[in-house]
């Protein structure tokens, strides 16, 4: 079975210091890139043990997933009108929500911004965050597909297959929302891409699973929850647990 040797922080980050400001501020050099290849170091495993239910907890999750399917195109109310300026304009000159450190430096371009500039920044910032959610969900889609290939138990393969479909819906919903309601999209952040690459590149299925659940889904859930609290968009704040789920 293929194995991956642990890498140093310098190798993972591709820089000598974790505090390298220029590297931290890196941007995507090719925003028009359509395809991005990552080496998958893992072996695809067949199992000839088809004993369904040998792992009851996974079997229970699999059965639950089969009856909880939904359609991103028809189960959400896409007729709801969204005004990005009203729904997501939380950074304003008067509210000063989280903007103090951006305006204190004398050379900051935001120092003399008024509400017009903060409104535009809010929309762009929200579009950037939604775009990163979408890219992260595609990362989770690839991770779950890899888990189907690499996990050794049939119950785990069954359940992971339902997660592949679920992550595909998440990507679909975010893209539809961005395309139809916001109209502004951003390429993947290079640091998020680095994280996704490293998770997918690892040969160990359990590390792929942990990386997906803790680093990708966990961070996304926290950020998504914060955005859920500050927006007034009815589609975005729908109470259904299936709506725009991460």
Tell where the protein language model's regions lie, with residue ranges.
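Carboxylate/His-rich catalytic cores and anion/metal-binding grooves
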Residues: 153, 158-183
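Acidic interhelical loop/turn segments
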Residues: 228-235
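A structural feature that tracks compact, well-ordered secondary-structure segments
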Residues: 144-145, 161, 221-226
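Conserved small/polar residues in nucleotide/adenosyl-binding loops
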Residues: 236-243
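Terminal targeting/low-complexity segments that flank the catalytic cores of oxidoreductases
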Residues: 1-145, 149-157, 180-187, 203, ...
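Active-site-adjacent scaffolding segments
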Residues: 171-228
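Short, contiguous, pocket-lining structural segments
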Residues: 132, 136, 140, 152, ...
């Amino acid at each position: 079975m293929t194995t991956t040797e642990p890498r140093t922080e310098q190798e993972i980050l591709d820089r000598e210091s974790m505090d390298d400001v220029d590297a931290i501020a890196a941007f995507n050099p090719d925003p028009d890139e359509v395809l991005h290849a990552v080496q998958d170091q893992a072996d695809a495993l067949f199992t000839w043990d088809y004993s369904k239910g040998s792992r009851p907890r996974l079997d229970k999750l699999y059965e639950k997933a089969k009856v909880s399917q939904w359609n991103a195109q028809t189960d959400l109310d896409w007729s709801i009108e969204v005004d990005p300026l009203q729904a997501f304009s939380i950074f304003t000159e008067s509210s000063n929500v989280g903007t103090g450190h951006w305006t204190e430096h004398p050379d900051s371009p935001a120092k003399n911004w008024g509400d017009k500039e903060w409104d535009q920044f809010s929309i762009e910032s929200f579009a950037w965050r939604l775009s990163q959610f979408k890219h992260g969900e595609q990362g989770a889609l690839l991770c779950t597909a890899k888990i189907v290939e690499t996990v050794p138990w049939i119950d785990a393969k069954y359940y992971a297959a339902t997660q592949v479909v679920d992550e595909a819906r998440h990507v679909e919903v975010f893209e539809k929302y961005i395309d139809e309601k916001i109209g502004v999209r951003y390429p993947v952040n290079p640091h998020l891409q680095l994280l996704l690459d490293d998770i997918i590149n690892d040969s160990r299925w359990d590390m792929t699973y942990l990386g997906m659940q803790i680093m990708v889904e966990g961070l996304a859930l926290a950020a998504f929850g914060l955005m859920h609290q500050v927006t007034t968009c009815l589609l975005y704040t729908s109470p259904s647990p299936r709506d725009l789920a991460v």
